[in-house]
């Protein structure tokens, strides 16, 4: 153990300290040097000595700037690190920063500050970081940042310093816990949280041109709140300690009524990593070693434009050439991962939750990409909440649970009179996604170490209140909403004299996904695989059971159950939806249960039991209400497709030994209802383009595990899932299809097939052998199918080429084949 001294642990110094105590925090532009403001640095940061831990700011933490011409404004602050003393091990928080400026900014070619290495920099740049903790001490939080800008900010090639990545940058980082904790039997210190960020912009933000630099991106406003890494526990071998919890990202709020122009139609920004209009990232950091839980992502709120009805106020225009991603508005809340356990008394660290987001635009957004296609998700509005993955387990412990995605639900809204338009392949209109983190895997080579559960997910809601969404490109969705449960972790494989291996973790449950489109709204896509509205609620798949190899007997791990899908529903209350392109549906809503995990394989000399397959997850209702007009023109471009599909059961694991029993295949689950109510006009123009297609489909049962040995029993197959109600109600309106095999209405309820029984192979040398093949299990039944025309004014017409006005089917799947005993293998 260290003695209590007053020395500080060294931490890196920023080169900002080189400016000394008199820092020109608001730098006059070259075009007007008659107005300037000198702001003295406060605290000790400006005069820090080499190798000394320090605190303070370079540039005043509070600045008020009038109507002058400037080049740059900045403030960077650090909290003091803890010291190696029992009462002073905690890091201090970073200072809060407030900038209120009415200046007009034209950036200078020479950057008057040196950026912290973990900042994107900006014409207005703020940075605050908490101090590091010592031993088990808690790291300091990043300070809060408030920026209010009233003036224009302009950046051109001639004034580009070549390094900054935004016009307005706000960064708050929590300090990190101690990675070298030598206080005996102590837990790791928690990482500091990122501070809250509030940015209000009234000024025009313009990047007219830039020097190409693929090592950076460019954003109009870029706000990042990030937690610090949790500190390491002293030792996983002695006592029962935990790694420090990772710091959470802070909340972020951006309000913008200034125009944001990045590039132009004649001069797009070229060769950048990314081009984003308004960007907010709240990111938790990892827990410390061992088994530290991750830090959560914070809530994000972005309000763009004014509710006064002028959609040009706060308009965002993005012109990008060959960037990895292009986004008008971008929100990302990431829960971090838990760390692996090396301590047999504790599970792997839990993954943390992603935060909720709320995005609202009253102003137009245009994103145009040229050159090579984006490598990352791009669109007019892109919002993502991601749970962190769980850490791996160790001997007789379980992998950490995956974090939840958007645990409290998230919304995106496009207001009346607003147009969100994109041009380019793989550039969507409005995207809202939430995903649970993956459960941690069990440790291989360790006894009975199971996978962790996947994270659950909250609801996603997308609203279009009289606005327009327009996309032009391949796989350029109009609206895309998804809630996806996390995958269960895999069970650890093991080799031992006797015992069992770990089971797979359960998949996480999905949240509901909804869309509401009002009268006056328009959603238009041009290009193949570009559905106007796509909504997915998908349960996470179960993890795979671990394999087991032994001498005296043992069993493999069971597969984890799949997570449940939730409701996927849209109310098109008078909106106009049109697509032009193959497989570009008008509306696609899907609820899908996660598949069960595969059982593990058991191999040995005596009694062996194959792992059972996991059960499939259930599916929720897939529901469409339509009173608007839907038009498609392309091959297999259905007007409305509603599907509820339950997860299939996992296949069972095989067994090999003198006495061997294959695992039982997992049962599939129930599908939900697939329901469509329409009183609007639906028209399709392509071949195989059905007007309305509603399907409720049960998943298939998992196959039973095979067995190999002298006395063998194959595993039974799992039962198929049931289809439930598939219904279409026409309350007036019309359906017209013109292509071949383009039915007006098709409704189906189909049960899933039962799983095959496991086969057996009897291997004997000079002795009789006994083998029993596994039994098959029955398939699921189909449910009710109902098509109703409640209004005699309704009409359904089809073109030539064997289409039917109405096609309905309900079918139960048959049982799968029971396995036969294979011929003996051996010699008398």
Q: What would you call each of these model-derived segments?
A:
Residues 77, 139, 172-174, 179-185, ...:
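Structural boundary/hinge residues at secondary-structure and domain interfaces
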Residues 59-78, 96-129, 145-168, 173, ...:
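Beta-strand-rich solenoid/repeat architectures in extracellular/passenger domains
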Residues 1-31:
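N-terminal secretory signal peptides that target proteins for export/translocation
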Residues 51-61:
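Cleaved targeting-peptide boundary
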Residues 133-137, 291, 396-397:
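Charged, low-complexity interaction regions
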Residues 71-98, 134-138:
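Extracellular beta-strand-rich solenoid/capping regions of secreted or surface-exposed proteins
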């Amino acid at each position: 153990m260290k003695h209590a001294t007053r020395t500080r642990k060294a931490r890196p110094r920023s080169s900002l300290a080189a400016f000394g105590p008199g820092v020109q925090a608001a730098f006059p532009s070259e075009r007007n040097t008659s107005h300037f403001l000198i702001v003295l640095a406060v605290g000790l940061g400006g005069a820090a000595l080499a190798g000394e831990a320090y605190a303070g700011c370079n540039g005043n933490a509070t600045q008020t700037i009038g109507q002058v011409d400037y080049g740059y404004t900045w403030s960077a602050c650090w909290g003091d690190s803890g010291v190696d003393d029992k009462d002073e091990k905690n890091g201090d928080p970073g200072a809060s920063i407030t900038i209120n400026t009415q200046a007009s900014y034209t950036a200078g070619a020479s950057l008057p500050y040196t950026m912290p290495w973990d900042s994107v920099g900006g014409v207005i740049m703020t940075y605050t970081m908490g101090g590091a903790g010592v031993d088990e001490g808690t790291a300091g939080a990043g300070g809060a940042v408030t920026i209010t800008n009233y003036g224009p900010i302009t950046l051109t090639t001639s004034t580009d310093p070549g390094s900054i990545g935004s016009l307005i940058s706000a960064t708050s980082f929590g300090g990190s816990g101690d990675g070298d904790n030598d206080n005996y039997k102590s837990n790791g210190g928690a990482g500091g949280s990122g501070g809250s960020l509030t940015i209000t912009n009234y000024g025009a933000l313009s990047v007219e041109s830039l020097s190409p630099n693929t090592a950076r991106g460019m954003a109009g406003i870029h706000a990042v709140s990030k937690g610090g890494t949790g500190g390491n526990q002293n030792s996983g071998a002695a006592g029962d300690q935990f790694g420090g919890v990772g710091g959470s990202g802070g909340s972020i709020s951006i309000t913008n009524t200034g125009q944001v122009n990045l590039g132009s139609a004649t001069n797009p920004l070229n060769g950048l990593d990314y081009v984003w209009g308004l960007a907010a990232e709240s990111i938790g950091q990892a827990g410390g070693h061992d088994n530290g839980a991750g830090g959560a992502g914070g809530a994000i709120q972005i309000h763009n434009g004014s509710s006064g009805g002028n959609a040009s106020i706060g308009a965002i225009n993005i012109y990008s050439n060959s960037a990895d991603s292009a986004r008008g508005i971008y929100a990302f809340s990431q829960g971090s991962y838990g760390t692996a356990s090396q301590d047999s008394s504790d599970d792997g660290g839990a993954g943390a939750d992603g935060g909720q987001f709320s995005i609202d635009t009253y102003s137009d957004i245009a994103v145009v990409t040229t050159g090579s296609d984006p490598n990352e998700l791009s669109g007019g509005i892109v919002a993502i909440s991601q749970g962190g993955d769980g850490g791996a387990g160790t001997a007789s412990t379980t992998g950490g649970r995956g974090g939840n995605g958007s645990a409290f639900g998230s919304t995106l809204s496009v207001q009346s009179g607003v147009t969100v338009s994109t041009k380019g392949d793989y550039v969507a209109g409005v995207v809202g996604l939430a995903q649970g983190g993956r459960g941690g895997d069990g440790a291989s080579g360790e006894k009975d170490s199971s996978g962790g559960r996947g994270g659950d997910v909250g609801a996603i809601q997308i609203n279009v209140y009289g606005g327009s969404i327009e996309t032009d490109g391949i796989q350029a969705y109009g609206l895309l909403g998804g809630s996806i449960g996390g995958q269960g972790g895999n069970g650890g494989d093991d080799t031992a004299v006797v015992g069992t291996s770990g089971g797979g973790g359960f998949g996480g449950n999905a949240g509901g996904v909804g869309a509401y489109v009002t009268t006056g709204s328009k959603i238009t896509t041009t290009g193949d695989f570009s559905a106007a509205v796509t909504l997915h609620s998908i349960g996470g798949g179960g993890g795979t059971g671990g394999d087991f190899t032994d001498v005296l007997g043992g069993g493999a791990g069971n597969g984890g159950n799949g997570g449940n899908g939730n409701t996927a529903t849209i109310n098109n209350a008078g909106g106009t939806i049109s697509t032009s392109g193959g497989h570009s549906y008008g509306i696609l809503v899907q609820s899908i249960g996660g598949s069960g995990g595969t059982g593990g394989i058991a191999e040995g000399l005596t009694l062996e039991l194959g792992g059972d397959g996991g059960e499939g997850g259930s599916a929720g209702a897939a529901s469409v209400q339509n009173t608007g007009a839907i038009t498609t023109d392309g091959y297999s471009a259905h007007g409305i497709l509603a599907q509820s599909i339950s997860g299939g059961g996992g296949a069972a694991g095989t067994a090999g030994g003198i006495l061997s029993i294959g695992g039982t295949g997992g049962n599939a689950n129930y599908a939900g209802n697939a329901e469509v109510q329409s009183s609007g006009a639906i028209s399709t123009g392509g071949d195989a383009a059905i007007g309305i297609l509603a399907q409720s489909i049960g998943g298939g049962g998992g196959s039973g595990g095979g067995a190999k040995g002298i006395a063998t029993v194959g595993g039974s197959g799992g039962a198929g899932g049931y289809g439930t109600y598939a219904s279409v109600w026409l309350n007036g309106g019309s359906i017209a299809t013109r292509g071949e095999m383009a039915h007006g209405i098709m409704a189906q309820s189909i049960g899933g097939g039962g799983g095959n029984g496991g086969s057996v192979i009897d291997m004997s040398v000079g002795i009789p052998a006994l083998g029993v093949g596994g039994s098959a299990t029955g398939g699921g039944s189909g449910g009710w199918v109902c098509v109703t025309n409640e209004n005699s004014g309704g009409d359904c017409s089809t073109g030539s080429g064997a289409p039917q006005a109405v096609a309905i089917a309900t079918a139960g799947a048959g049982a799968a084949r029971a396995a036969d005993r294979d011929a003996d293998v051996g010699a008398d």
